Amino acid sequence: MCDAFVGTWKLVSSENFDDYMKEVGVGFATRKVAGMAKPNLIITVNGDMITIRSESTFKNTEIAFKLGQEFDEVTADDRKVKSTITLDGGALVQVQKWDGKTTTINRKIVDDKLVVECIMKGVTATRIYERA
């Protein structure tokens, strides 16, 4: 199910992330620090629980969830959101909702790379990770 995602991933490229963070409402100083961070993602599966841990010089975050079940999340920029993650066509699709706003984060494996698309209104950031 999600086995292809399991492992440690390092960020190798990031496109349009500052514009995405701006659209989300992240402040200037936080955007500058977060934009320079090169996070590692550690993804594990234990039964029906999936854990995604992000480790960087900016901040460490971790979410643990079951597919299709809403959970509370505090994001790296300290937004308190309701998240739901589903598996759709081999992609992990995360929808975050807060204060009447919605953003979508799609994670998929393409050519053994983890491609993460962050979408807010008309702005899309693409971040590519390789296995560490």
UniProtKB/Swiss-Prot annotation:
GO cellular component, one term: nucleus
Superkingdom of this protein's organism: Eukaryota
Modification Phosphoserine, positions: S13
Subcellular location(s) of the protein: Cytoplasm; Nucleus
Tissue: Adipose tissue.
Entry GO MF terms: fatty acid binding; hormone receptor binding; long-chain fatty acid binding; long-chain fatty acid transmembrane transporter activity
Pfam families listed in its UniProt record: Lipocalin
PTM annotation (Phosphotyrosine): residues: Y20
Keyword presence, Transmembrane: no
Keywords, comma-separated and alphabetical: Acetylation, Cytoplasm, Lipid-binding, Nucleus, Phosphoprotein, Transport
N-acetylcysteine: residues carrying this PTM: C2
Motif Nuclear localization signal: positions: 22-32
Signal peptide positions (record): none
Residues annotated to bind a fatty acid: R127, I128, Y129
PROSITE patterns named in the record: FABP
Similarity-based family: Belongs to the calycin superfamily. Fatty-acid binding protein (FABP) family.
Domain notes: Forms a beta-barrel structure that accommodates the hydrophobic ligand in its interior.
Reported function: Lipid transport protein in adipocytes. Binds both long chain fatty acids and retinoic acid. Delivers long-chain fatty acids and retinoic acid to their cognate receptors in the nucleus. Involved in the regulation of intramuscular fat accretion.
Protein name: Fatty acid-binding protein, adipocyte
Species: Sus scrofa
